[in-house]
Amino acid sequence: GFLDKVIKVCGRDLVRIKIDICGKILLGDMTTGQEKQRILGSGQSAEIMPSSINKEVDSLNMLESIANLPEELRAMLPEKQPSSPQLQQYVPALKNSNVAVKELNKIIRGRQEEAEDNSHSLLKDFNLNIYSPKKRQLDMTVSEKCCQVGCTRRFIANSC
């Protein structure tokens, strides 16, 4: 079929085909969920985390951070997320409060570290850690094979 046809492509053409194939798989244009699982094989998860879920997770993390702020700081937060000029008006109030700047820095750093830890675990859970050496090595293998001997679209789809 379409996915099993051997193609020999290099450079930009390979990148275009990979974007096309991966885009179709990720957006669901090419197949249904069961077919995605069959194409990608049982070793990889075919479930995709939509960006709307990412936004909800970010909002939830922000709300949890706000909930854990000292009452004095929470009282200064506006109803909606402030823009940069709006934040500037709170700087004098923070400096005059009895909350030490060092304490505030500790709270902020702790929240940032927690957020980074959570984001890495989410990426691992969804097999989306695109920065891993294994993923980079796999991509290099795909380009070498497709350019030198040819490969199937299914082989390219497995690297998405």
UniProtKB/Swiss-Prot annotation:
PROSITE patterns for the chain: INSULIN (PS00262)
Matching InterPro entries: Insulin-like, Insulin-like_sf, Insulin_CS, Relaxin, Repro_Hormone_Insulin-like
One term of GO molecular function: hormone activity
Protein name per the record: Prorelaxin
Coiled-coil region(s): none
Tissue/organ expression: Expressed in the endometrium during pregnancy and in mammary gland during lactation.
SUPFAM superfamilies referenced in this protein's UniProt entry, alphabetically: Insulin-like
Cystine pairings recorded for this chain: 10-147, 22-160, 146-151
Propeptide: 34-133
The organism of origin for this protein: Cavia porcellus
CDD domains in the cross-refs: IlGF_relaxin_like
Pfam families linked to this entry: Insulin
Subunit structure: Heterodimer of a B chain and an A chain linked by two disulfide bonds.
Function: Relaxin is an ovarian hormone that acts with estrogen to produce dilatation of the birth canal in many mammals. It bears mature young, and allows separation of the pelvic bones.
GO cellular component: extracellular region
Family, as annotated: Belongs to the insulin family.
Keyword line: Cleavage on pair of basic residues, Disulfide bond, Hormone, Secreted
Intracellular or extracellular location(s): Secreted
Superkingdom to which the source organism belongs: Eukaryota
UniProt cross-references to PANTHER family, sorted A to Z: PRORELAXIN H2 (PTHR12004:SF13), RELAXIN (PTHR12004)
